[in-house]
Amino acid sequence: MAIITAAQAKAYIPTLSASSSTDDALLVTLTSRFDAVAAAHLGYVRQSAGAFSIESGTYIEYLDGPGGRELHLSAKPVTAIGSIYDDPDAEYTSDELIASADYTLYGIEGLVMLDTTGADTYFSTAHRAIKATYTAGYS
C-alpha cells in the first residue's frame, strides 16, 4: 500500500484529470521514490524486504547490546514486536527469547523498556547481542 494513491495525488495537482489513468503509473513511481527518499532521510533502516520505506513493514535488526533497561529501535513508530532475543553468543535460540510480558513498548519513540520484575532486567553489552523483529512505519 502506498503512502498516497494516484487518485489522492491527482486531487492536489489541478492540471491532472481525475478520470484519466494516463499519469497513474508515473504518479505511483514518483510516490514510491519519494517514500524511499523520505525514509532514508529520516534514518530508517531497510525493511526485511530490502527497501527503504516509511510505510508499515517488518524490520529485523541486529543491535549491539546497550546494557541497561532501554533498547532504541531504528524505525518508528513501532506498532508491534515480533520477538526480541538477547544473546551474547549471537545464536538467538528460544532460550534467549525475551518474553513479551517482560518489557513495555513505547511505539512512537521506538523504545523498548525492560520491566524490573521480569526474568530479564538488563540487556547484555555484547556486540550484536540483540535481534529484534518488529513492525514499524505508517499505514
Q: Predicted segment positions?
A:
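Divalent metal-cofactor coordination and adjacent catalytic microenvironments
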Residues: 1-139
